[in-house]
Amino acid sequence: VHWTAEEKHLLGSLWAKVDVADIGGEALGRLLVVYPWTQRFFADFGNLSSATAICGNPRVKAHGKKVFTMFGEALKHLDNLKETFASLSELHCDKLHVDTENFKLLGNLVIVVLAARLHDSFTPAAQAAFHKLAYSVAHALARRYH
């Protein structure tokens, strides 16, 4: 994947405005609410019985922060995403057996949350850059499956 200087600048400048814990928790919470079949991977997280329970669940928030922190790592390694996510790809493929489509779904929800939080800062160019990032991360996570 080739990243332009403008894309790198947009990603970096907007990332600086992001509260990783807050946005990560919301994105993962939305994944579990909007796509309830993904809850099976989080059965040990306790109460996932409703949207309110999911979005208020401290384990969902903590794991969302962890997931979103990895998006930050991606920004540091844009030219080497496959290597950066190799161990996570192996974990999700070999141990957790996560369908790769779920990576794309989460990426789309990250974009939804960023748009809601960043308002006018999340321009069409910024959306395109984050979409490219989300797709690239999903592709890197799916690498072990091929």
Swiss-Prot record:
Keywords: Heme, Iron, Metal-binding, Oxygen transport, Transport. InterPro entries: Globin, Globin-like_sf, Globin/Proto, Hemoglobin_b, Hemoglobin_oxygen_transport. GO terms for molecular function: haptoglobin binding; heme binding; metal ion binding; organic acid binding; oxygen binding; oxygen carrier activity; peroxidase activity. Heme b binds at residues 63, 92. Sphenodon Hbs have properties not found in other reptiles: poor cooperativity, high affinity for oxygen, small Bohr and haldane effects, appreciable phosphate effects (those properties are also found in the Hbs of primitive urodele and caecilian amphibians). Belongs to the globin family. This is Hemoglobin subunit beta-1. It comes from Sphenodon punctatus (Tuatara).
